[in-house]
From Swiss-Prot:
Assembly notes: The type I restriction/modification system is composed of three polypeptides R, M and S; the restriction enzyme has stoichiometry R(2)M(2)S(1) while the methyltransferase is M(2)S(1).
Gene that encodes it: hsdS
PANTHER family assigned to the protein according to its UniProt record, in alphabetical order: TYPE I RESTRICTION ENZYME ECOKI SPECIFICITY SUBUNIT, TYPE-1 RESTRICTION ENZYME ECOKI SPECIFICITY PROTEIN
Note: Type I restriction and modification enzymes are complex, multifunctional systems which require ATP, S-adenosyl methionine and Mg(2+) as cofactors and, in addition to their endonucleolytic and methylase activities, are potent DNA-dependent ATPases.
Protein name: Type I restriction enzyme EcoEI specificity subunit
Lineage, broadest ranks: Bacteria, Pseudomonadati, Pseudomonadota, Gammaproteobacteria, Enterobacterales
MF GO annotations: DNA binding
Coiled coil, from the record: none
Organism: Escherichia coli
Amino acid sequence: MAVEKLITDHIDIWSSALQTRSMAGRGSNGKIDLYGIKKLRELILELAVRGKLVPQDPNDEPASELLKRIAAEKTELVKQGKIKKQKPLLRISEDEKPFELPEGWEWITLSEIATINPKIEVTDDEQEISFVPMPCISTRFDGAHDQEIKKWGEVKKGYTHFADGDIALAKITPCFENSKAVIFKGLKGGVGVGTTELHVARPISSELNLQYILLNIKSPHYLSMGESMMTGSAGQKRVPRSFFENYPIPFPPNTEQARIVGTFSKLMFLCDQLEQQSLTSLDAHQQLVETLLATLTDSQNAEELAENWARISQYFDTLFTTEASIDALKQTILQLAVMGKLVSQDPNDEPASELLKRVEQEKVQLVKEGKIKKQKPLPPVSDDEKPFELPIGWEWCRIGEIIANMDAGWSPACSPEPSPNEDIWGVLKTTAVQSLEYREQENKTLPNSKLPRPQYEVHDGDILVTRAGPKNRVGVSCLVEKTRSKLMISDKIIRFHLISDDISAKYISLCLNRGVTADYLEASKSGMAESQMNISQENLRSAPIALPPTAIQLKVISTIEDFFKVCDQLKSRLQSAQQTQLHLADALTDAALN
């Protein structure tokens, strides 16, 4: 099958096989990987090095003739003292050959055609040379690299040496698996040094096609075999030199190498175009979804909202076809909920103003009984803090008006592993608090040498808010609906409890994560850098909240749960369809190779 036909006949599979990577943090949608196009690139590369990308030409000089010339050149270089004489190389056995080669091809090793890990000779410490650390080495198929300029005296010791025309391969995980490999070009003075995590091959003959050799050490089969040969501990595994210099490489006639590289480059350009079209299409789709969903939250009244919803529901199957679009729908539902637009209002419901009066009376009584501390009165929510008009029966208030005592915990030095059971105390990590989700397993074991502080134990009904950490992890909130015993909050988590059972803790937790209250918390974050931000208890107490009647709170939560069930079913079907597309892309790849 011609590769162009392989691409065009199955364009729908290559472009629709998507994979979502989950990413933690408030408001983060999973990043989409174009899995099908990635598999297509790998397939083209694998076909290239197996002799299946371009047709063979019987008039091409066989690879064996070029290898003879390289061997003669090597002998001459040894005579001239330019390279050291090698021990006789072992022939590649039949068992070592991973697949059958076309006529005119030969199996070689890099040690046959190159000097491995050579040195450079520079005598002047003041001479400027290129310096190439690992971040300057790309994963691109063209072997591109960036460079810095250093003086030889600064870097002559403790680094890997290389020169223009050398081919280098990253040997450490995960750089090797990510195919970091390079052809050095344009080095200052023709020479350079860089990261010690490289194997370097200096080709013996100018007849060698460096780009073709590079394709081999980036091919999926080569990377897979290299990964299986790695040695060392986790996180520090490396591909040994013996693999780099001795693993069999398929070697075609020189003219075919040039045809392979040319065709490969053209097909990569096609893949680039396909990738760009897919990304543009995904972006356009997401923008369309967000624009249409914005019409719901921007609706001025119930009639306009109904019209806009009817317009969207006509195209439901077309609009909500990605995980990001379904997540956007969920966020819109939450936004409508806290604006009072999700459910119809009942004029017979007791207004929230009466609820707030009872809460205030209950608070006064608790202060008298010494169960909570008296707090300074909070100012009314100003008009500037009210971004929209509330439905009849709703009231603006502040978090501090409806809660009992607020506190934060403590952060003793703990063992990293979680507490195994309820007999052993643990301290919650901030990752226990996710948006609208409590994860009790995210804790650290309190050492036996430290006494627990039961006053910080988390209880059912507590609302938790992350107080300190990276910007995207501060102000994240959840309700503890149910928890095991003997888990304490850390000093990076604020905890509070509502005064009255007539206020839904689920609804308040929702407000903390979406809408006016969440926006206020976002604006209240402070810190010298985004990597370490804070929210104070005072700011949290002052956060405005749109409080509906009790009956509406319960109705809102019930409606959200119903909507979310539908969204989760949509997402489950989508994930199942995506998995099928991934399997199709894999099957197509296997069929083309075999």
